[in-house]
């Protein structure tokens, strides 16, 4: 339906474009009563002012939105750069997950939001990678010999910094909220000032104000013209009216004189009665001042107030003294408790420190012993490896020796089998001798080689047996060393578990220390508050004593003043006669003024009676003009449909203004057309205004 209406509007605008170009602008009338065109002009200008205020709000919102967008874009660029840096760091270090390494989850902050999207998944991945890199580095960089005093000092410094930062944060948040509220107030004031400026510069409002002021002027001018016309008519019609006016004037003067006489008599009677009262009161006061008693002083209001104030001050001083004594006792008790707690904590910390140092020394000694045993075992292992290699070479030599012996035996058997006596007999004696010598030399060489090989084999066998014995001994020592190693590892595990327990105890003790530090700070704050209150009480006591002394001095001054007043009384009696004379002069002046007032009142009554006469003759035309102007103003401000409610909703399609109730009723009844021009509108075309 709204889409069809928009189409109709576009069609109508396109058809009537040429007519709108030649259509003259609306003009506000400058004088005379307000017309219907002036009312329409007034409505349009009100809508224009409201649209300008909406535009200003929109510009402010767009400016804020642009600032937020620029901040968002800069933050997104920074996040992308930081992500690339972290990715390059992770790639440089290389992420390799190890099963033995425990991730320290307290290093990096976890994500707080529950729904995990793409960005949250990426951040979780980066966090896991950084934890795998940082946790082993932090574990390796932890020192075993940590000084507790340094740790406690650092904790105290950090706690102090945290407290200061919290206080600064609270103050800054309060300042921020105050500045935000001030900025909102200033924006609202600026908008109201802009609206007021628009209303001041609007022609229609100036025209209405002029019409309202001109209405009163018109009434006065009309009354004056009526008077002049009446006078003219009376002079033309009847010349005897002058005599009537003179008669009325004389009668009014006589009445004025009578009223003046009556006022003079009343004022004289009042003056006489007042004079008698004043004389009596003066005599009574003089008698009282001459004969002042203690009862009069006690019954005096100032004396009672001073006495009550003195009592209150004494009671407050006593109460403050009691409170001071109780606070001093509490302070002493708190100081004693604080010293006892400090001594206990120092004792416990020293004992725990000594036990930890002893356990650490034991573990270091055991570690040195285990390392020496390990080094010995490694050296023996290298020796055994070398001996094992020598044994393999000996086995190979023995195999070679066996092969050579077998070869010699085979050659000898062949020699015996192939040796023919016929050949030997064929040889000569010299050849036989040479051959025998050669054989003897060969036999000697063979025997020598055999002996050498035999000695080598025997020495090798001896060394092998020695090595086997050594291996057996070393295996026994190795088993012993393994047992010692396993025992030391068990001891190491127990020490590591004890170390963890001690670490947890140290953490608990540190938490207790931090809690005790907080308690100490709170106690110190309380002590400071109590000392301040004690000082305040002392100051109050001193001030009370000073006030008491001042009151005593004031009482003495009152006694002195009493004597001086008695002296002044005689002087006052002398002055009384002067005052009586002044009183008579004042009474005369007052009587004269009363006479003047009576005359003026009588003139006012006479003028009012004349005005009533003139108003009864010619006031119908003025009243009709006033009614017309009032109806015009009502038509501007009241709804033309129901004529009950004020106009507060404008239809932006045609510019007509009605009340919100009538527009909503028409929308609910699906009568979506303007009652005056019959143009279609929707709920989006309504605009709330303030006339």
Curated annotation (Swiss-Prot):
Disulfide bonds: none annotated. It is an enzyme of class 2 (transferase). A zinc finger (RING-type) spans 639-678. One of its GO terms (biological process) is chromatin organization. Its EC number is 2.3.2.27. GO terms for molecular function: ubiquitin protein ligase activity; zinc ion binding. It is found in: Nucleus. InterPro entries: E3_ubiquit_lig_Bre1 (IPR013956), Znf_RING (IPR001841), Znf_RING/FYVE/PHD (IPR013083). Residues 49-83, 147-459, 491-620 form a coiled coil. Its main location: nucleus. Keywords: Chromatin regulator, Coiled coil, Metal-binding, Nucleus, Transferase, Ubl conjugation pathway, Zinc, Zinc-finger. Belongs to the BRE1 family. PANTHER family: E3 UBIQUITIN-PROTEIN LIGASE BRE1 (PTHR23163:SF0), RING FINGER PROTEIN-RELATED (PTHR23163). E3 ubiquitin-protein ligase that mediates monoubiquitination of histone H2B to form H2BK123ub1. H2BK123ub1 gives a specific tag for epigenetic transcriptional activation and is also a prerequisite for H3K4me and H3K79me formation. This is E3 ubiquitin-protein ligase BRE1.
């Amino acid at each position: 339906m709204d889409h069809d209406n928009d189409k109709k509007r576009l069609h109508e605008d396109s058809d009537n474009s040429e007519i709108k170009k030649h259509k003259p602008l609306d003009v506000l009338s400058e004088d005379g009563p307000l017309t219907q065109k002036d009312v329409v002009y007034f409505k349009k200008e009100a809508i224009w002012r409201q649209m300008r205020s909406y535009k200003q709000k929109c510009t402010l919102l767009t400016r804020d939105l642009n600032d937020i967008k620029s901040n968002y874009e800069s933050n997104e660029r920074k996040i992308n750069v930081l992500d690339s840096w972290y990715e390059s760091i992770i790639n440089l270090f290389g992420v390799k997950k190890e099963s033995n390494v425990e991730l320290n989850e307290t290093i990096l902050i976890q994500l707080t939001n529950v729904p995990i999207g793409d960005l949250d998944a990426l951040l979780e991945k980066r966090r896991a990678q950084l934890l795998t890199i940082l946790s082993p580095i932090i574990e390796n960089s932890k020192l075993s010999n940590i000084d507790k005093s340094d740790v406690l000092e650092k904790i105290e410094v950090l706690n102090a910094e945290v407290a200061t930062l919290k206080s600064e944060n609270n103050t800054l948040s309060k300042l921020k909220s105050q500045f935000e509220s001030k900025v909102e107030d200033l924006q609202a004031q600026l908008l109201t000032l802009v609206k007021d400026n628009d209303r001041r510069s609007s022609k229609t409002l100036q025209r209405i104000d002029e019409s309202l002021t001109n209405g009163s002027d018109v009434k006065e001018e009309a009354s004056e013209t009526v008077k002049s016309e009446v006078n003219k008519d009376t002079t033309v019609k009847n010349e005897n009216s002058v005599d009537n006016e003179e008669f009325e004037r004389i009668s009014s003067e006589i009445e004025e004189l009578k009223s003046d006489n009556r006022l003079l008599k009343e004022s004289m009677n009042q003056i006489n009665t007042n004079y008698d009262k004043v004389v009596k009161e003066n005599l009574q006061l003089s008698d009282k001042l001459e004969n002042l008693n203690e009862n009069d002083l006690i019954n005096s209001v100032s004396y009672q107030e001073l006495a009550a104030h003195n009592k209150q001050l004494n009671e407050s001083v006593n109460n403050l003294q009691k409170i001071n004594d109780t606070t001093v006792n509490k302070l002493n008790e708190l100081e004693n408790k604080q010293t006892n707690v400090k001594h206990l904590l120092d004792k416990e910390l020293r004992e725990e420190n000594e036990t930890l140092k002893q356990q650490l020394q034991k573990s270091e000694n055991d570690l040195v012993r285990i390392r020496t045993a390990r080094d010995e075992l490694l050296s023996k292992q290298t020796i055994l490896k070398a001996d094992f290699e020598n044994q393999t070479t000996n086995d190979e030599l023995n195999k070679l020796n066996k092969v050579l012996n077998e070869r010699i035996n085979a050659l000898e058997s062949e020699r015996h089998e192939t040796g023919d006596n016929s050949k030997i007999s064929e040889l000569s004696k010299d050849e036989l001798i040479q051959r025998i010598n050669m054989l003897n030399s060969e036999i000697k060489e063979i025997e020598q080689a055999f002996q050498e090989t035999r000695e080598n084999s025997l020495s090798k066998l001896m060394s092998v047996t020695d090595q086997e014995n050594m291996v057996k001994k070393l295996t026994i020592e190795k088993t012993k060393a393994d047992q010692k190693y396993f025992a030391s590892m068990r001891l190491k595990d127990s020490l590591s578990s004890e170390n963890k327990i001690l670490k947890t105890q140290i953490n608990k003790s540190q938490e207790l220390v931090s809690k005790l530090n907080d308690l100490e700070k709170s106690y110190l704050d309380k002590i400071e508050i109590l000392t301040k209150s004690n000082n305040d009480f002392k100051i109050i006591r001193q001030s009370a004593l000073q006030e008491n002394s001042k009151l005593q001095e004031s009482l003495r001054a009152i006694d002195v003043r009493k004597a001086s007043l008695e002296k002044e009384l005689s002087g006052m009696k002398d002055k009384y006669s002067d005052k009586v004379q002044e009183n008579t002069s004042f009474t005369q002046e007052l009587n004269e003024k009363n006479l003047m007032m009576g005359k003026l009142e009588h003139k006012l009554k006479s003028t009012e009676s004349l005005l009533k006469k003139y108003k009864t003759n010619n006031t119908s035309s003025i009243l009709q003009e006033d009614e017309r102007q009032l109806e015009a103003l009502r038509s501007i401000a009241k709804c033309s449909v129901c004529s009950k409610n004020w106009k507060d909703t404008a239809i932006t399609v045609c510019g007509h203004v009605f009340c919100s109730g009538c527009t909503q009723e028409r929308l609910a009844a699906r009568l979506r057309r303007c009652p005056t021009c019959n143009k279609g509108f929707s709920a989006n075309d309504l605009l709330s205004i303030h006339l």
